[in-house]
């Protein structure tokens, strides 16, 4: 990769493990950012329903930011990575019936875009239209597909990210241009640890996706008993209404720009991620390294991280430390787990 271009972990100074003495600051109620107060209300209600570490878990932040990113020029493509039964699906269920939210449980190579004359272009052009949020609660099934099917699905996701394209056949060539889709799609995909096998191969998913490693809170037997016998359970309809209100209000608060220091931090992080995700070829027998490919260019990563940070600021405001903490967690999550452990 070139010694002069390598970014060290010390240069980036990422606090990937989290500092227990550096919790998100508590502001006085009179000074609190309005959307932040609404966010806390939603999170507190979820904590009555699920086991949540409200100080160190940023799943609600990340999902909310991805939803409001559809208002950006380039919406977010986010992978929520976590073990089965870690709460990912429960969070995503809270978005059901939200405007422009579309959930798919099964993907084939011809689901999102299709050249069939009766398909109206596929699910994205025909159902989602020009703008929407695509949610796949179990993207692991896609990773389990055969390589040819998987690559075709990845190709269609790249079209969705780029905001223009479609699928054509050799029969109806006269209508190819008319079938081309243009729009903006934000994506929220839930996936297990299997995604780690693909992070090391940037050519498969490219630098379009961001990742968030969601670690379920570990509790002991007494805590589990106390939680399971709680009388207080949130009203899901009320909770969904507040989430919808939070998203609407946050969309209106999206900042146009971010401070220069934060822009430099994000670009440095994007370059660091790109270097850590560089593809390495090894000998099949000896496992010796044969070739380290040039890292991907960080421009799309930089754009995605910048968009994420803007959305987090729209939720929490500039005075809160929570946007930077959530951003840092995503930066660490974008690096393959094994390589992350090595640099730690």
Range-by-range predicted roles:
Residues 56-69, 159, 302-311:
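Contiguous, well-ordered alpha-helical segments that form the cores/surfaces of helical PPI scaffolds
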Residues 176-184, 192-328:
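Phosphate-sensing "switch" segment of ASCE/P-loop ATPases
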Residues 36-76:
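Pre-Walker A (pre-P-loop) alpha-helix and adjacent loop at the N terminus of AAA/AAA+ ATPase modules
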Residues 32-36, 49-57, 81, 147-150, ...:
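Conserved phosphate/pyrophosphate-binding and hydrolysis machinery centered on Walker-type P-loop NTPases
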């Amino acid at each position: 990769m070139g010694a002069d271009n390598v970014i060290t972990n010390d240069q980036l100074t990422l606090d990937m493990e989290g500092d227990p003495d550096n919790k998100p600051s508590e502001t006085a109620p009179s000074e609190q950012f309005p959307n932040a107060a609404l966010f806390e209300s939603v999170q507190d209600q979820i904590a009555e329903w699920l086991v949540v570490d409200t100080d160190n878990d940023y799943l609600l932040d990340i999902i909310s930011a991805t939803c409001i990113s559809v208002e950006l020029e380039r919406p977010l493509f986010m992978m929520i990575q976590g073990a089965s039964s870690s709460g990912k699906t429960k969070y995503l269920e809270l978005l059901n019936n939200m405007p422009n939210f579309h959930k798919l449980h099964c993907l084939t190579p011809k689901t999102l875009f299709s050249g069939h004359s009766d398909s109206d272009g596929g699910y994205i052009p025909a159902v989602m239209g020009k703008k929407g949020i695509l949610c796949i609660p179990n993207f692991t099934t896609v990773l389990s597909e055969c390589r040819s099917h998987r690559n075709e699905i990845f190709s269609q996701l790249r079209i969705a990210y780029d905001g223009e394209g479609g699928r054509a056949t050799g029969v109806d060539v006269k209508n190819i241009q008319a079938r081309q889709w243009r729009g903006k799609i934000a994506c929220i995909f839930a996936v297990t640890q299997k995604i780690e096998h693909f992070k090391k191969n940037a050519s498969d998913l490219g630098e379009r996706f961001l990742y968030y490693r969601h670690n379920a809170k570990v509790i002991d037997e007494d805590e589990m008993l106390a939680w399971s016998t709680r009388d207080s359970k949130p009203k899901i309809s009320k909770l969904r209404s507040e989430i919808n209100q939070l998203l609407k209000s946050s969309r209106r608060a999206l900042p146009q720009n971010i401070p220069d220091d934060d822009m430099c931090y994000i670009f440095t992080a994007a370059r660091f991620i790109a270097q850590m995700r560089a593809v390495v070829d090894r000998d099949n027998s000896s496992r010796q390294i044969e070739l380290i490919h040039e890292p991907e260019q960080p421009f799309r990563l930089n754009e995605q991280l910048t968009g994420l940070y803007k959305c987090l600021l729209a939720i929490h405001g500039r005075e809160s430390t929570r946007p930077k903490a959530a951003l840092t967690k995503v930066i660490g999550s974008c690096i393959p787990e094994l390589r992350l452990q090595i640099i730690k």
